[in-house]
Design a protein with these regions (language model features):
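RNase H-like, Mg2+-dependent phosphodiesterase core
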Residues: 1-101, 105-293
Length: 293
């Protein structure tokens, strides 16, 4: 909760503490009225109001002030977090490099479905509250953030490596291929690329950042777009291949998925180079995925 630049002068003309008329009128509101005005509606609070609420003789009003204080502190903390998240981007923006891209992947560990990647170029100065490593967010938070990211992006793109490519190349190489595809699908291409702890075979300079999806706004944004896209895809696959629970676990090796795999056997989108799928097929474990990561 922010305090607006509008202020109430809390001194009368000769310097004696006084309540301005508008502030006095506000403080005549009931606890419910004050809650509706400042807590439920999240309107900005003119400077001078919050201190008055803290000193109000009504316990309910003082409780509202506590809520507003916590909301203000949380907003300030989020602003500081977003500032830290744009450190890598600002290093390039400040040197005149406007097209700073970020790329990330999801779906490396599942037993079923493709690897999905997303690449994003955010507008200079973009600040999207709530962006974080997609794994740290709820499904509802990701679904709310993905449209905001796309709206504030200069461009964004999806890449994919199929189940067949995963089985043929190995999961690590397939992930690199999907990352490259997402980047090369961007238009315009980035002038500089931020990558989560690896290097990609693309024709532009890049900065690998360990845990980049939690340290870079652009990589975090890409991780959210990729996760939402893959989740929707796996829900579609659940309708096509019922019985495995793909819309719930998204292909990851949960007990429910492993039980369904043993009961039903693999379907077309199961990764046959992964050990649990091979065991369900009765194949020798020695022929399992050559190198997962």
């Amino acid at each position: 909760m922010a305090e607006s630049s509008e202020a109430f002068d809390l001194q009368d003309p000769i310097g004696t503490p006084a309540l301005p008329a508008r502030l006095a009128e506000l403080l005549k509101l009931s606890v419910g009225g004050l809650r509706a005005r400042f807590v439920d509606s999240e309107l900005e609070i003119p400077r001078g109001v919050l201190p008055a609420l803290r000193e109000d003789p009504r316990a309910g009003v003082r409780a509202l002030a506590t809520i507003l204080d916590k909301r203000r502190d949380a907003k300030r903390a989020e602003e500081r977090r977003i500032t830290r998240l744009t450190l890598f981007e600002r290093e390039h923006w400040d040197r005149g490099i406007e097209l700073v891209g970020g790329v990330d992947e999801v779906g490396m560990a599942p037993l079923a479905g493709p690897v999905i990647t997303a690449a994003v170029i955010l507008r200079r100065g973009a600040r999207i509250k709530g962006v974080n490593d997609s794994k740290q967010l709820t499904s509802e938070e990701r679904e709310a953030l993905a449209p905001q990211i796309k709206e504030q992006a200069i461009c964004w793109a999806i890449g994919e490596a199929s189940v067949e490519e995963i089985d043929r190349l190995n999961i690590y190489q397939a992930g690199l291929l999907a990352l490259k595809r997402a980047v090369m699908n961007l238009s315009p291409l980035p002038q500089h690329l931020l990558v989560d702890a690896r290097r990609i075979d693309v024709p532009m300079p890049q900065t690998p950042i360990i845990q980049g999806d939690a340290k870079s706004l652009t990589i975090g944004a890409a991780s959210i777009v990729a996760k939402v896209h893959r989740d929707h895809l796996m829900s579609e696959m659940d309708r096509k291949y019922p019985g495995y629970g793909l819309s719930q676990h998204k292909g990851y090796p949960t007990p429910v998925h492993l039980e369904a795999l043993d009961r039903l056997g693999p379907c077309e989108i199961h990764r046959r180079s992964f050990g649990p799928v091979q065991r369900a097929l009765g194949l020798d474990a020695a022929s399992k995925q050559r190198s997962l990561f």
